[in-house]
Amino acid sequence: MKKQSYIIALLAGLFALASCQDGNWDIPEGIPYGNNDLKAGTTVTIAELQSTYASVISSDNYKQITEDLWLRCVVNGNDYGDNLYKQLSVQDGTGGIIIGINGSDQGAFMPVGQKLLINLKDLYIGGYGNMAQIGGLYNGGLGRMELTEWKQHVRLIMDNMPEAQAFGTMKVDTIDFDPNKTMAQQCGRVVRLSGVTIARDGTPVIAPDDGSVSLVSNCVNRTLSGGNAGKKCVLRTSTYASFKGVTIPTTPVELYGIATIYRGTWQILARTQSDLTWVK
């Protein structure tokens, strides 16, 4: 399925290239994903957005964004490794946030480092386990927005476009995980954990699906201890992740991932196998 998606993305890229046969090789007529007609209005940062809706987020409620607000951000995590299920993680210079999208293989179009311009008006923001998330309504609560809706609200910004200048030096960066930081300070960011030990319950691989460990929504939560993990931190991995069978070392390791939190427990989501630094 993922291979097919990348073939589609490649063909889409060739289509965009073909549209430049009039001599303008720098800027294609349009990118075959998202809404190329979007033009930014009043912009807001992720920190400002989370501050404005802080009470909604902390109470696990939700609210529709009715103002014409725009967000400039960059993708720092996607579903390429099949561990961020129907989720996109983005950041700007002030923080990070998770976006729920009811669509698969979005990493084929929005790789890590891709700049996005998002029209927030009419989307929903709220809390899931006290963590901020942007999405849509599902069964009367906050969930994932439909893919068709997402594509109407997002524009992919390439570095050779004039619009890219407004992003300044925005890029994906990594911060050291700190268990004492708040949700707004750390969630949706790429974090580094050093000198941590991963629990080896059951079959000692990252996410066994053989019944040897308990699953929560088809995910394995492995306790992280030592190093900078703090007291309530787990490595959360889907049993569908492409790296689910990686063996867990018996010694402390360094690992990376997207920081999320659920009701006071930090959950680290490795994006791909490369986030597990002991794998060569």
What are these regions (language model features)?
Residues 1-8:
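Bacterial N-terminal signal peptides that target proteins for export
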Residues 16-19:
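C-terminal motif of bacterial Sec signal peptides marking the signal peptidase cleavage site
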Residues 21-85, 89-115, 119-280:
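OB-fold nucleic-acid-binding modules
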